[in-house]
Amino acid sequence: MIHHLRNRRIALLGLGVENHALARFFQAHHIPFSVCDSRDLSTPLEGVSEWRLGDDYLEDLTDFDLLFRTPGLPVLNPNIITARHQGVEISSQTRIFLQLCPAPVLGITGTKGKGTTTVLTRTLLATDTSTRIFSGGNIGRPPIEFIDQLQPDDRVVLELSSFQLQDLDQSPELALILSITQDHLDYHADRAEYIAAKKTIATHQTSDNILIVNQDCPIAQSFAAESPATIWAFSATTPVVQGAWIAAGQLWARRLGEQATAICPLTDIPLRGRHNWANAAAAVAAGLAFGAEETPFAAAIRSFKSLPHRLEHIAERDGIAYYNDSLATTVDAAIAAIESFDQPLLLIAGGASKNAEFSALSTAIARNNVRAALLIGQEAPRIAAALQQVGSGEIAHICQDLPSALATARRLAKVGDVVLLSPACASFGEFKSYEERGDCFRQLVTA
């Protein structure tokens, strides 16, 4: 396939992280390509056939016959649709990786929990020291960076977002679907299009493949009902026929037709909240489905470290604990964080709009021990209004920015309280990314 690419008229649409990695891959294999980007790039690549930079970079795409879309460029962009209708092939870094990869791939998707589950799954698979494990995708590095290192007996674990999945015509050999709720409605046309993008991870699987689904999620279950693949499952509430689940204070697992095995007590899982117990069950199910033995799983789980910006304990100051959950950019993620604490909470929430509704968040705040809601960003007034509707308007404090929200939280907090940054919103506006927002919170707390 690589040889045939040398005869194509290729353009990279957007030179972000993924397409930059793809450009280096093309350069290494002497494949000519052009770059189209809205930005005036300060450090352009060498050896590019043509540069098309500026606001009109998506014009005249039919000059090419193969386009590699950056994940941030929706497939429903009118210029992309026009090019496709005129016979131009639309691809992506993820798609070409799956086409070229000689090793079996486990793809992991869901609305939240992908990063934690991906890293934990990689940790469990790595207990088999006879096999090399590679991971990347939406977390870590673009997998095209390690494609030339792969051998057929390696294993690959990829975190895949809806942006990366939406136009795939090939599914990974193993697919793991976590909870699917609602996200990125600022990007997708509607909820149905978002769900359809997620479904692509399993759409093209065959009877030789494996699909692992969240038994507690009706949407994931509906994907399984239509799949020809062998079905595995995980659950935070009930036993499964083949996979892993939570029951009686333990994490359990079994293969089809075998007795259930207790992997470890829940107290050994170093992650907060029932949603993270489900993530651990998902990782165990994926590890077993990928052929790993469960004996060393308990030790690997006990030693697992929480990822940054995911209910990350920052510090304790004057009897007050501070947690950074900046990755919680959806309502459901923020609710899961709130429900993971028994202590009184001072919640910092808000940010840029993702067209979310906040009624469920306000209900969760009202039902749990949230003493104050420090609200920031574009969505602060809407969250405050939602709290007013459930009779909790008095706990809302609209703050100018994150530093002022933290200052207010410190003023209101008492010994034994928890100050939790769990925004339920995107970071854009005040910050470039959820990482920058979380890093700012950490710096403010520890200063």
Q: Positions of the model-derived regions?
A:
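N-terminal leader/targeting and accessory segments in enzymes
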Residues: 1-92, 96
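C-terminal helical cap/extension that packs against the catalytic core
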Residues: 45, 50, 359-417
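Residue-level signal for inorganic ion chemistry
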Residues: 26, 67, 108, 138, ...
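Extended acidic/charged loop-beta regions that coordinate divalent cations
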Residues: 37, 55-59, 150-187, 221-266, ...
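Phosphate-binding loop of NTP-binding sites
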Residues: 59-62, 71-215, 219-228, 411, ...
